[in-house]
Amino acid sequence: MRILVSNDDGVDAAGIRMLASVLREAGHEVTVVAPDRDRSGASNSLTLDLPIRLKRIDHYTVSVAGTPTDCVHLALTGLLEFEPDIVVSGINNAANLGDDVIYSGTVSAAMEGRFLGLPAVAVSLVTRNHDPKHFETAARAAVEIVARLKADPLPADTILNVNVPDLPWNEVKGFEVTRLGNRHRAEGCIAQKDPRGNEVYWIGPAGREQDSGPGTDFHAVRTGHISITPIQVDLTRYQALEKVASWVGGLSAALDQPA
């Protein structure tokens, strides 16, 4: 298969290098289009106010001064001379579990591929303190999942969010299909002063696990399993439609009132 690989940790990150290498060893034609530096937490942001510069590192690798979404968007709307068969994003050097997917550049790169009509997979290694031991395990999981997608495609609106425990391949307990869990509210921001006495702030850590029982992505990786969560872009809260619809009459009546 022709595979577009991207990430949010940057084009030189160990995870993306391992992913591209193992996919090539499996016989795939891999092109890497990735940010020129770490863009973790970039979510789905597109650069619209500046031109996007890039550097062609070699025939198969492009470094982009932009977000993960920029990378995939450019690749699929004009940069590449061919249409890939699938987008694989990763390997992220940290978990993307539960609410993390809203902020994740790794997941957003895959999501942009899905927006533009391609199957898409986001792969993350659940590391401790960003100290990865077994990127090869996550890469092998990606190879297996790509093979399965080729043989048995999913519906067109589906993205796979894959989280892999940081274990040797032979210590992984198996694969589990999961739903997204969620976290408690994020911890507070961290206030500091710069050398000139001006206030500066750092975003605080993500909240601790809250909804993390059996069936969730949190539980799967905690018990040594590879979590596969099918996700989609439709953010509609269908359970609230009827309640909100009950307001509409009153809201519409306000249109008849004087301004």
From Swiss-Prot:
The entry's localization annotation reads:
Cytoplasm
Q: What is its main location?
A: cytoplasm
Q: Which Enzyme Commission number(s) are on file for it?
A: 3.1.3.5
What cystine pairs are annotated? none
Q: Which GO terms describe its cellular component?
A: cytoplasm
Q: Does the keyword Protein biosynthesis apply?
A: no
Taxonomy, superkingdom = Bacteria
Residues at which a divalent metal cation binds: D8, D9, S40, N92
Q: Which UniProt keywords apply?
A: Cytoplasm, Hydrolase, Metal-binding, Nucleotide-binding
MF terms in GO: 3'-nucleotidase activity; 5'-nucleotidase activity; exopolyphosphatase activity; metal ion binding; nucleotide binding
The note on the cofactor says: Binds 1 divalent metal cation per subunit.
- InterPro entries recorded: SurE, SurE-like_Pase/nucleotidase, SurE-like_sf
Q: Does the keyword Protein biosynthesis apply?
A: no
Question: What are its cofactors?
Answer: a divalent metal cation
At the top of the EC hierarchy, this enzyme's class is: hydrolase
Pfam families this protein is in? Answer: SurE
Recorded catalytic activity of this chain's protein: a ribonucleoside 5'-phosphate + H2O = a ribonucleoside + phosphate
Q: What does this protein do?
A: Nucleotidase that shows phosphatase activity on nucleoside 5'-monophosphates.
**Alphabetical list of HAMAP family matching this protein:** SurE (MF_00060)
Q: Give the UniProt family note.
A: Belongs to the SurE nucleotidase family.
What is the name attached to this protein's record? 5'-nucleotidase SurE
